From Swiss-Prot:
Protein name: RNA-binding protein NOB1
MF term (GO), any: RNA endonuclease activity
Main localization, broad class: nucleus
Phylogenetic placement of the source organism: Eukaryota, Metazoa, Chordata, Craniata, Vertebrata
Species, as recorded: Mus musculus (Mouse)
Gene name for this UniProt entry: Nob1
One Gene Ontology CC term in the entry: nucleus
InterPro entries linked: NOB1, Nob1_euk, NOB1_Zf-like_sf, NOB1_Zn-bd, PIN_dom, Ribonuclease_PIN, WRNPLPNID
Entry function: May play a role in mRNA degradation. Endonuclease required for processing of 20S pre-rRNA precursor and biogenesis of 40S ribosomal subunits.
UniProt key word Ubl conjugation: no
SMART domains, per database record: PINc
Protein backbone atom coordinates (compact mmCIF):
# COMPACT_ATOMS: atom_id res chain seq x y z
CA UNK A 1 0.00 0.00 0.00
CA UNK A 2 1.65 3.20 -1.19
CA UNK A 3 1.24 6.23 1.08
CA UNK A 4 -0.86 9.15 -0.10
CA UNK A 5 1.04 12.32 -0.99
CA UNK A 6 -1.17 14.81 0.93
CA UNK A 7 -3.43 13.80 3.83
CA UNK A 8 -5.79 16.05 5.81
CA UNK A 9 -6.41 14.76 9.34
CA UNK A 10 -9.49 15.37 11.45
CA UNK A 11 -9.69 15.18 15.24
CA UNK A 12 -10.92 11.59 14.99
CA UNK A 13 -7.62 10.51 13.43
CA UNK A 14 -5.67 11.82 16.43
CA UNK A 15 -8.14 10.44 18.96
CA UNK A 16 -7.94 6.98 17.35
CA UNK A 17 -4.13 7.22 17.26
CA UNK A 18 -4.05 6.50 13.54
CA UNK A 19 -0.59 5.80 12.06
CA UNK A 20 -0.63 8.88 9.84
CA UNK A 21 3.09 8.56 9.05
CA UNK A 22 2.25 5.28 7.25
CA UNK A 23 -0.88 6.65 5.58
CA UNK A 24 0.54 9.81 4.00
CA UNK A 25 3.73 11.72 3.34
CA UNK A 26 2.53 15.26 4.12
CA UNK A 27 0.03 15.57 6.98
CA UNK A 28 -2.15 18.70 7.12
CA UNK A 29 -4.69 19.98 9.62
CA UNK A 30 -6.02 23.24 11.04
CA UNK A 31 -5.39 24.73 14.46
CA UNK A 32 -9.04 24.42 15.50
CA UNK A 33 -8.71 20.63 15.29
CA UNK A 34 -5.88 20.61 17.82
CA UNK A 35 -7.85 22.95 20.10
CA UNK A 36 -10.78 20.54 20.11
CA UNK A 37 -8.65 17.78 21.65
CA UNK A 38 -8.91 17.90 25.44
CA UNK A 39 -7.88 14.50 26.80
CA UNK A 40 -4.38 14.21 28.22
CA UNK A 41 -3.34 11.04 26.39
CA UNK A 42 -3.99 12.50 22.95
CA UNK A 43 -2.33 15.82 23.79
CA UNK A 44 0.76 13.96 24.98
CA UNK A 45 0.90 12.09 21.67
CA UNK A 46 0.54 15.38 19.80
CA UNK A 47 3.54 16.78 21.68
CA UNK A 48 5.87 14.04 20.36
CA UNK A 49 4.62 13.21 16.87
CA UNK A 50 6.92 11.06 14.69
CA UNK A 51 6.10 13.24 11.66
CA UNK A 52 5.77 16.92 10.82
CA UNK A 53 2.25 18.26 11.22
CA UNK A 54 1.55 21.14 8.83
CA UNK A 55 -1.03 23.78 9.77
CA UNK A 56 -2.83 25.38 6.84
CA UNK A 57 -5.96 27.52 6.74
CA UNK A 58 -8.41 27.10 3.83
CA UNK A 59 -9.33 30.01 1.58
CA UNK A 60 -12.74 31.68 2.07
CA UNK A 61 -14.03 30.72 -1.38
CA UNK A 62 -13.50 27.02 -0.67
CA UNK A 63 -15.21 27.34 2.72
CA UNK A 64 -18.18 28.96 1.00
CA UNK A 65 -18.27 26.26 -1.69
CA UNK A 66 -18.18 23.39 0.81
CA UNK A 67 -20.84 25.06 2.97
CA UNK A 68 -23.25 25.37 0.05
CA UNK A 69 -22.57 21.78 -1.02
CA UNK A 70 -23.18 20.40 2.49
CA UNK A 71 -26.51 22.24 2.63
CA UNK A 72 -27.59 20.50 -0.57
CA UNK A 73 -26.61 17.06 0.70
CA UNK A 74 -28.42 17.59 4.02
CA UNK A 75 -25.33 17.16 6.22
CA UNK A 76 -24.91 20.85 7.11
CA UNK A 77 -26.79 20.66 10.47
CA UNK A 78 -24.47 17.82 11.56
CA UNK A 79 -21.23 19.68 10.72
CA UNK A 80 -19.43 22.14 12.95
CA UNK A 81 -17.39 25.11 11.77
CA UNK A 82 -14.20 23.08 12.26
CA UNK A 83 -15.55 20.21 10.16
CA UNK A 84 -16.39 22.59 7.30
CA UNK A 85 -12.87 24.05 7.40
CA UNK A 86 -11.34 20.56 7.24
CA UNK A 87 -13.51 19.76 4.21
CA UNK A 88 -12.54 23.06 2.60
CA UNK A 89 -8.83 22.34 3.17
CA UNK A 90 -9.22 18.95 1.49
CA UNK A 91 -10.96 20.58 -1.47
CA UNK A 92 -8.23 23.25 -1.67
CA UNK A 93 -5.40 20.69 -1.73
CA UNK A 94 -7.27 18.68 -4.38
CA UNK A 95 -7.60 21.84 -6.49
CA UNK A 96 -3.90 22.71 -6.09
CA UNK A 97 -2.32 19.32 -6.81
CA UNK A 98 -4.91 17.46 -8.93
CA UNK A 99 -7.57 19.84 -10.24
CA UNK A 100 -11.31 20.28 -9.92
CA UNK A 101 -12.48 19.00 -13.31
CA UNK A 102 -13.45 15.61 -11.87
CA UNK A 103 -15.22 17.00 -8.79
CA UNK A 104 -18.98 17.40 -8.61
CA UNK A 105 -20.62 20.80 -8.28
CA UNK A 106 -24.07 19.45 -7.39
CA UNK A 107 -24.95 16.34 -5.36
CA UNK A 108 -27.17 13.64 -6.77
CA UNK A 109 -30.70 14.50 -5.71
CA UNK A 110 -33.25 11.82 -5.05
CA UNK A 111 -36.27 12.27 -7.32
CA UNK A 112 -39.47 10.30 -7.22
CA UNK A 113 -40.35 8.73 -10.57
CA UNK A 114 -43.55 6.82 -11.11
CA UNK A 115 -43.23 3.18 -12.12
CA UNK A 116 -45.39 1.66 -14.84
CA UNK A 117 -45.12 -1.82 -13.38
CA UNK A 118 -48.44 -2.84 -11.86
CA UNK A 119 -49.57 -6.32 -10.86
CA UNK A 120 -52.16 -7.72 -13.19
CA UNK A 121 -54.17 -9.35 -10.41
CA UNK A 122 -54.26 -9.18 -6.65
CA UNK A 123 -51.91 -11.69 -5.06
CA UNK A 124 -51.94 -13.73 -1.83
CA UNK A 125 -55.64 -13.40 -1.01
CA UNK A 126 -56.62 -16.05 1.50
CA UNK A 127 -59.43 -18.31 0.37
CA UNK A 128 -59.10 -17.51 -3.35
CA UNK A 129 -56.96 -18.83 -6.16
CA UNK A 130 -56.24 -16.20 -8.81
CA UNK A 131 -54.27 -17.47 -11.83
CA UNK A 132 -51.73 -15.08 -13.33
CA UNK A 133 -53.02 -15.41 -16.87
CA UNK A 134 -56.32 -16.71 -18.22
CA UNK A 135 -55.65 -19.74 -20.39
CA UNK A 136 -57.91 -20.52 -23.34
CA UNK A 137 -60.27 -23.41 -22.89
CA UNK A 138 -58.99 -25.27 -25.95
CA UNK A 139 -55.47 -25.39 -24.48
CA UNK A 140 -56.79 -26.86 -21.26
CA UNK A 141 -58.66 -29.55 -23.16
CA UNK A 142 -55.61 -30.53 -25.21
CA UNK A 143 -53.41 -30.95 -22.11
CA UNK A 144 -55.96 -32.94 -20.13
CA UNK A 145 -58.01 -35.99 -20.84
CA UNK A 146 -60.30 -35.99 -23.82
CA UNK A 147 -63.72 -34.60 -22.91
CA UNK A 148 -66.84 -35.97 -24.53
CA UNK A 149 -68.94 -32.81 -24.43
CA UNK A 150 -69.00 -29.17 -23.37
CA UNK A 151 -70.51 -30.10 -20.03
CA UNK A 152 -67.25 -31.67 -18.80
CA UNK A 153 -65.13 -28.73 -20.07
CA UNK A 154 -65.29 -26.72 -16.84
CA UNK A 155 -64.32 -29.65 -14.64
CA UNK A 156 -61.45 -30.71 -16.89
CA UNK A 157 -59.95 -27.20 -16.88
CA UNK A 158 -60.43 -26.90 -13.12
CA UNK A 159 -58.15 -29.87 -12.48
CA UNK A 160 -55.10 -28.11 -13.92
CA UNK A 161 -54.93 -25.03 -11.67
CA UNK A 162 -55.97 -26.57 -8.39
CA UNK A 163 -53.33 -27.67 -5.87
CA UNK A 164 -52.27 -31.28 -6.56
CA UNK A 165 -52.46 -33.86 -3.79
CA UNK A 166 -49.13 -34.61 -2.08
CA UNK A 167 -47.22 -37.79 -2.86
CA UNK A 168 -46.24 -39.34 0.48
CA UNK A 169 -43.65 -41.78 -0.88
CA UNK A 170 -41.78 -39.09 -2.80
CA UNK A 171 -41.72 -36.71 0.19
CA UNK A 172 -40.42 -39.47 2.45
CA UNK A 173 -37.52 -40.19 0.08
CA UNK A 174 -36.64 -36.48 -0.09
CA UNK A 175 -36.59 -36.20 3.72
CA UNK A 176 -34.26 -39.18 4.04
CA UNK A 177 -31.88 -37.77 1.41
CA UNK A 178 -31.87 -34.31 3.05
CA UNK A 179 -31.14 -35.84 6.46
CA UNK A 180 -28.07 -37.65 5.14
CA UNK A 181 -26.75 -34.48 3.47
CA UNK A 182 -27.18 -32.46 6.68
CA UNK A 183 -25.24 -35.06 8.68
CA UNK A 184 -22.38 -34.94 6.17
CA UNK A 185 -22.32 -31.11 6.30
CA UNK A 186 -22.19 -31.14 10.11
CA UNK A 187 -19.23 -33.53 10.06
CA UNK A 188 -17.39 -31.29 7.58
CA UNK A 189 -18.09 -28.23 9.74
CA UNK A 190 -16.72 -29.99 12.83
CA UNK A 191 -13.54 -30.87 10.96
CA UNK A 192 -13.10 -27.27 9.79
CA UNK A 193 -13.77 -25.93 13.30
CA UNK A 194 -11.02 -28.10 14.69
CA UNK A 195 -8.60 -26.40 12.31
CA UNK A 196 -9.51 -22.97 13.78
CA UNK A 197 -10.54 -21.44 10.46
CA UNK A 198 -12.73 -18.35 10.79
CA UNK A 199 -12.31 -18.05 14.58
CA UNK A 200 -10.37 -15.44 16.56
CA UNK A 201 -7.81 -17.24 18.68
CA UNK A 202 -4.94 -15.95 20.86
CA UNK A 203 -2.53 -16.91 18.08
CA UNK A 204 -4.14 -14.79 15.32
CA UNK A 205 -5.72 -11.92 17.27
CA UNK A 206 -2.79 -9.54 16.65
CA UNK A 207 -2.85 -10.25 12.93
CA UNK A 208 -6.59 -9.53 12.77
CA UNK A 209 -6.13 -6.28 14.70
CA UNK A 210 -3.44 -5.17 12.26
CA UNK A 211 -5.73 -5.93 9.33
CA UNK A 212 -8.55 -3.91 10.90
CA UNK A 213 -6.31 -0.94 11.67
CA UNK A 214 -4.94 -0.76 8.14
CA UNK A 215 -6.10 2.18 6.05
CA UNK A 216 -7.61 0.94 2.80
CA UNK A 217 -6.50 3.51 0.23
CA UNK A 218 -7.20 3.27 -3.50
CA UNK A 219 -4.39 3.48 -6.01
CA UNK A 220 -3.21 6.75 -7.59
CA UNK A 221 -4.60 8.96 -4.81
CA UNK A 222 -2.84 12.30 -4.32
CA UNK A 223 -5.09 13.94 -1.71
CA UNK A 224 -7.23 12.29 0.94
CA UNK A 225 -8.94 13.03 4.24
CA UNK A 226 -8.77 10.83 7.34
CA UNK A 227 -11.92 11.27 9.41
CA UNK A 228 -14.31 9.14 11.44
CA UNK A 229 -17.25 11.54 11.09
CA UNK A 230 -19.87 9.92 8.84
CA UNK A 231 -21.38 13.28 7.86
CA UNK A 232 -17.98 14.51 6.65
CA UNK A 233 -17.37 11.24 4.81
CA UNK A 234 -20.72 11.53 3.05
CA UNK A 235 -19.93 15.08 1.84
CA UNK A 236 -16.46 14.02 0.66
CA UNK A 237 -17.80 11.05 -1.27
CA UNK A 238 -20.55 13.04 -2.95
CA UNK A 239 -18.06 15.74 -3.99
CA UNK A 240 -15.74 13.14 -5.49
CA UNK A 241 -12.94 13.49 -2.92
CA UNK A 242 -11.13 10.53 -1.38
CA UNK A 243 -11.90 9.31 2.14
CA UNK A 244 -9.23 7.33 3.97
CA UNK A 245 -10.52 4.82 6.50
CA UNK A 246 -9.21 4.20 10.01
CA UNK A 247 -10.21 0.96 11.83
CA UNK A 248 -12.57 0.12 8.97
CA UNK A 249 -14.91 3.03 9.70
CA UNK A 250 -15.73 4.07 6.15
CA UNK A 251 -18.94 5.00 4.40
CA UNK A 252 -19.47 2.35 1.74
CA UNK A 253 -21.79 4.48 -0.39
CA UNK A 254 -22.92 8.08 -0.40
CA UNK A 255 -26.43 8.56 0.92
CA UNK A 256 -28.97 11.14 -0.07
CA UNK A 257 -31.30 12.70 2.45
CA UNK A 258 -34.74 14.24 2.23
CA UNK A 259 -37.04 15.86 4.76
CA UNK A 260 -40.26 14.01 5.53
CA UNK A 261 -43.14 15.50 7.48
CA UNK A 262 -44.47 13.02 10.04
CA UNK A 263 -47.68 15.05 10.25
CA UNK A 264 -48.88 15.04 6.63
CA UNK A 265 -46.24 12.57 5.24
CA UNK A 266 -45.11 14.95 2.49
CA UNK A 267 -41.46 14.95 1.43
CA UNK A 268 -39.12 17.64 0.15
CA UNK A 269 -35.53 17.65 -1.07
CA UNK A 270 -34.90 21.21 0.20
CA UNK A 271 -32.80 20.52 3.29
CA UNK A 272 -32.87 24.17 4.42
CA UNK A 273 -36.55 24.11 5.31
CA UNK A 274 -37.62 24.17 8.95
CA UNK A 275 -41.39 24.10 8.50
CA UNK A 276 -43.41 21.82 6.22
CA UNK A 277 -44.48 23.55 3.01
CA UNK A 278 -47.78 21.61 2.91
CA UNK A 279 -49.15 21.72 6.47
CA UNK A 280 -46.90 24.47 7.88
CA UNK A 281 -45.91 22.55 11.03
CA UNK A 282 -42.43 22.10 12.43
CA UNK A 283 -42.56 18.34 11.89
CA UNK A 284 -39.82 17.71 9.33
CA UNK A 285 -37.40 14.84 9.98
CA UNK A 286 -34.30 13.90 8.00
CA UNK A 287 -34.66 10.51 6.29
CA UNK A 288 -32.02 8.72 4.22
CA UNK A 289 -33.21 7.51 0.83
CA UNK A 290 -31.97 5.31 -1.99
CA UNK A 291 -33.25 4.99 -5.54
CA UNK A 292 -34.08 1.52 -6.84
CA UNK A 293 -33.36 0.27 -10.35
CA UNK A 294 -36.93 0.92 -11.48
CA UNK A 295 -36.76 4.56 -10.34
CA UNK A 296 -38.82 4.20 -7.18
CA UNK A 297 -37.75 5.96 -3.99
CA UNK A 298 -36.90 3.79 -0.98
CA UNK A 299 -36.87 5.56 2.40
CA UNK A 300 -34.95 4.13 5.38
CA UNK A 301 -36.68 4.84 8.69
CA UNK A 302 -35.06 4.57 12.08
CA UNK A 303 -36.31 1.98 14.56
CA UNK A 304 -35.25 4.14 17.47
CA UNK A 305 -38.42 5.30 19.26
CA UNK A 306 -36.65 8.46 20.44
CA UNK A 307 -36.71 9.86 16.90
CA UNK A 308 -40.41 10.70 17.18
CA UNK A 309 -40.54 11.08 20.95
CA UNK A 310 -43.08 13.84 21.78
CA UNK A 311 -41.45 14.58 25.12
CA UNK A 312 -40.59 18.23 25.52
CA UNK A 313 -42.79 19.46 22.66
CA UNK A 314 -45.59 20.78 24.88
CA UNK A 315 -44.54 23.75 26.97
CA UNK A 316 -45.75 27.23 27.85
CA UNK A 317 -44.72 29.96 25.43
CA UNK A 318 -43.16 33.11 26.87
CA UNK A 319 -44.83 36.47 26.52
CA UNK A 320 -43.92 38.10 23.17
CA UNK A 321 -41.34 40.84 23.61
CA UNK A 322 -40.83 43.91 21.48
CA UNK A 323 -37.81 46.01 20.76
CA UNK A 324 -34.85 45.91 18.44
CA UNK A 325 -33.05 43.06 20.21
CA UNK A 326 -36.00 40.90 21.22
CA UNK A 327 -35.58 37.16 20.73
CA UNK A 328 -38.90 35.34 20.40
CA UNK A 329 -39.43 31.64 19.59
CA UNK A 330 -39.67 30.79 15.90
CA UNK A 331 -43.22 29.45 15.48
CA UNK A 332 -44.13 30.03 11.83
CA UNK A 333 -42.21 30.24 8.57
CA UNK A 334 -43.36 33.77 7.71
CA UNK A 335 -42.59 35.16 11.17
CA UNK A 336 -40.65 38.40 11.04
CA UNK A 337 -37.54 38.94 13.13
CA UNK A 338 -35.49 42.08 13.85
CA UNK A 339 -32.33 42.56 11.84
CA UNK A 340 -30.07 42.60 14.91
CA UNK A 341 -27.53 45.08 13.59
CA UNK A 342 -24.43 46.35 15.29
CA UNK A 343 -24.43 49.70 17.00
CA UNK A 344 -23.27 52.75 15.05
CA UNK A 345 -20.18 53.02 17.22
CA UNK A 346 -19.17 49.43 16.50
CA UNK A 347 -19.77 49.83 12.75
CA UNK A 348 -17.32 52.72 12.46
CA UNK A 349 -13.96 51.87 10.93
CA UNK A 350 -10.77 53.79 11.65
CA UNK A 351 -9.01 54.74 8.42
CA UNK A 352 -6.15 57.16 9.05
CA UNK A 353 -5.65 57.69 5.31
CA UNK A 354 -9.23 58.83 4.70
CA UNK A 355 -9.56 62.51 3.64
CA UNK A 356 -12.21 63.17 6.32
CA UNK A 357 -10.19 61.58 9.11
CA UNK A 358 -9.98 63.68 12.27
CA UNK A 359 -7.60 62.54 14.98
CA UNK A 360 -9.44 61.94 18.21
CA UNK A 361 -8.32 61.05 21.67
CA UNK A 362 -6.74 57.80 20.44
CA UNK A 363 -5.65 56.88 16.89
CA UNK A 364 -6.65 53.25 17.47
CA UNK A 365 -10.03 51.68 16.68
CA UNK A 366 -12.59 51.77 19.44
CA UNK A 367 -14.00 48.53 20.75
CA UNK A 368 -17.67 48.77 21.64
CA UNK A 369 -18.39 46.86 24.86
CA UNK A 370 -21.13 48.95 26.48
CA UNK A 371 -23.96 49.01 23.93
CA UNK A 372 -26.92 46.66 24.01
CA UNK A 373 -25.78 44.82 20.87
CA UNK A 374 -22.30 44.28 22.30
CA UNK A 375 -23.71 42.87 25.55
CA UNK A 376 -25.94 40.45 23.61
CA UNK A 377 -22.98 39.52 21.34
CA UNK A 378 -24.82 40.56 18.18
CA UNK A 379 -22.82 40.31 14.97
CA UNK A 380 -23.32 42.18 11.73
CA UNK A 381 -25.13 40.72 8.72
CA UNK A 382 -21.85 40.23 6.84
CA UNK A 383 -20.44 38.35 9.82
CA UNK A 384 -23.41 36.05 10.44
CA UNK A 385 -26.07 38.19 12.02
CA UNK A 386 -29.35 37.07 13.45
CA UNK A 387 -29.50 33.61 14.95
CA UNK A 388 -25.92 32.49 15.12
CA UNK A 389 -25.18 28.88 14.31
CA UNK A 390 -23.09 27.37 17.09
CA UNK A 391 -21.18 24.10 17.21
CA UNK A 392 -23.76 21.26 17.22
CA UNK A 393 -21.23 18.89 18.83
CA UNK A 394 -20.52 21.13 21.81
CA UNK A 395 -21.83 20.06 25.20
CA UNK A 396 -24.83 22.01 26.42
CA UNK A 397 -25.32 23.16 29.99
CA UNK A 398 -28.30 21.70 31.78
CA UNK A 399 -30.12 24.25 33.87
CA UNK A 400 -31.62 22.74 37.01
CA UNK A 401 -34.30 24.77 38.72
CA UNK A 402 -33.27 25.40 42.31
CA UNK A 403 -35.87 24.87 45.00
Amino acid sequence: MAPVEHVVADAGAFLRDAPLQDIGKNIYTIREVVREIRDKATRRRLAVLPYQLRFKEPLPEYVRLVTEFSKKTGDYPSLSATDIQVLALTYQLEAEFVGVSHLKKEPEKAKVSSSIQHPETALHISGFHLPSKSKPLQEAVDRGHAADGPENLEFSSFMFWRTPLPNIDRELQELLIDGREEEEEEEECEDSDDDGGGWITPSNIKQIQQELEQCDTPEDVQVGCVTTDFAMQNVLLQMGLHVLAVNGMLVREARSYILRCHGCFKTTSDMNRVFCGHCGNKTLKKVSVTINDDGTLHMHFSRNPKVLNPRGLRYSLPTPKGGKYAINPHLTEDQRFPQLRLSQKARQKTDVFAPDYIAGVSPFAENDISSRSAILQVRDGMLGAGRRRLNPNASRKKFVKKR
